[in-house]
């Protein structure tokens, strides 16, 4: 899969007889699911939403307006591009797209602790999954650790400098 693609939904079961399918949103932007929105599968095939019911989270895709055709979509993963995501999903001040945070250095007091490799959501907040820098691993620190994405630990995020400034993240690493 092209690194410019972002997973946004999984198509669930068929609903009714006219080809509607349940959409399981995998992101933070349900507003991207609307009439004429374009998505892709892992092979780059296009899927265009013909209609979307916000309350039921069901979609009808162009060319799949029949239950037998729609059944072929069940369990298909839908993707969009980073470019379309930036265009269609508006962020509030201080918010970032997950794909922009991946790969940023975790820095504390000028020391690079590691690199963000993944982001996991728990019920209350996101957790940054960090691969510890080789220098720290070589002196006995854990290979990976988590940093809660909350003000207590994250001071600032700079996409320009490719870093997240933290406080007390090293304490988490030391106790991992």
Swiss-Prot record:
Gene3D superfamilies associated with the record: PRC-barrel domain (2.30.30.240), RimM (2.40.30.60)
Domain of life assignment: Bacteria
Keyword terms of this UniProt record: Chaperone, Cytoplasm, Ribosome biogenesis, rRNA processing
Keyword Ribonucleoprotein: no
Record has Cytoplasm as a keyword: yes
SUPFAM superfamilies membership: PRC-barrel domain (SSF50346), Translation proteins (SSF50447)
UniProt GO cellular component terms: cytoplasm; ribosome
GO biological process: ribosomal small subunit biogenesis; rRNA processing
Domain PRC barrel: 93-172
Protein localization: Cytoplasm
GO MF annotation terms: ribosome binding
Quaternary structure (record): Binds ribosomal protein uS19.
Classification via HAMAP family: Ribosome_mat_RimM
Family per record: Belongs to the RimM family.
Name recorded for this polypeptide: Ribosome maturation factor RimM
Species this chain originates from: Campylobacter curvus (strain 525.92)
């Amino acid at each position: 899969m092209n690194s410019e693609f972002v997973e946004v939904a999984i198509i669930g079961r068929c609903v009714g007889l006219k080809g509607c399918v349940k959409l399981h949103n995998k992101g933070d932007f349900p507003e991207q699911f609307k009439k004429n929105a374009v998505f892709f599968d892992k092979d780059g095939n296009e899927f265009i939403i013909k209609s979307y019911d916000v309350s039921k989270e069901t979609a009808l895709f162009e060319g799949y307006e029949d239950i037998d055709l729609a059944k072929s979509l069940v369990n298909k993963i839908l993707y969009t591009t980073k470019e379309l995501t930036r265009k269609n999903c508006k962020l509030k001040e201080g918010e970032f797209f997950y794909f922009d945070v991946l790969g940023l250095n975790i820095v504390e007091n000028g020391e690079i602790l590691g690199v963000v490799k993944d982001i996991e959501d728990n019920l209350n907040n996101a957790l940054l999954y960090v691969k510890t820098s080789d220098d720290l691993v070589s002196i006995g620190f854990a290979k990976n650790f988590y940093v809660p994405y909350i003000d207590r630990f994250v001071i600032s995020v700079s996409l320009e400098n490719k870093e997240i400034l933290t406080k007390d993240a090293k304490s988490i690493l030391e106790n991992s």
